[in-house]
Design a protein with these regions (language model features):
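Active-site core of metal-dependent hydrolases
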Residues: 1-64, 68-86
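Detector for methionine-enriched segments
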Residues: 2, 8, 54, 96, ...
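Generic secondary-structure boundary/loop-capping signal
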Residues: 6, 76, 124-127, 146, ...
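Short, structured secondary-structure boundary patches
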Residues: 10-17, 70-74, 95-97, 127-132, ...
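His/Asp/Glu-enriched, well-ordered alpha-helical/loop segment
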Residues: 60-143
Length: 177
């Protein structure tokens, strides 16, 4: 059971695939509330990440958790080469759009892919912000309207369509430990 697994985790550990329905759902879908053991884990310092992959993002779970005051700490993808030719699309921009469609405020979506991951990795002095002296991968995006977004169960929602218009990758060699 997930409750037993959560008890083994320490503050700062990250639970990924937090918005999936099976095998471990973080919400009671009948009451649309976050399970007590999940909330207790967050109170102990356990972090929760989206990790959208082939079977790990469900709009109903995400909407219920976010509405119950339980947004993800970080947003990531579980994107692998074998996912390129599949029906489930989950680029980081699409995953960000799905979280916004599920009720997460846009600024919180952006923080969950920038400064929060940097802080979790204890690199907040080097990453996660646009400040002189910091490393940054920069992406200029343009919102071009809305689009249809699909979760792994086939449920659809309307959400923002963001297109990358320009990108620049930093040289991270100065961060080597």
């Amino acid at each position: 059971p997930m409750a037993e697994q959560l008890e083994m985790l320490r503050p700062g550990d990250v639970v990924t695939y937090c918005f999936r329905r099976r095998p471990h759902c973080i919400v009671d879908l009948k009451t649309r509330t976050v399970l007590p053991e999940i909330r207790s884990a967050r109170e102990r310092g356990i972090l929760f990440d989206v990790g959208h992959g082939m079977g790990s993002f469900d709009f109903e779970v995400a909407e219920a958790a976010i509405a119950d005051g339980f947004p993800p700490d970080t947003i990531s993808t579980d994107f692998q080469h074998r996912h390129l030719d599949t029906h489930t699309k989950h680029s980081l921009l699409l995953v960000m759009a799905k979280l916004q469609a599920a009720g997460m405020p846009e600024m919180e979506v952006f923080r969950a892919v920038t400064d929060r991951p940097a802080k979790i990795l204890r690199r907040e002095n080097y990453l996660g912000g646009i400040i002189p002296g910091m490393c940054a991968d920069l992406v200029a995006m343009n919102r071009t309207g809305d689009c249809q977004l699909t979760d792994v169960e086939g449920a659809e929602r309307r959400g923002p369509r963001w297109e990358m218009t320009m990108g620049m990758q930093s040289d991270y060699s100065s961060l080597d430990d």
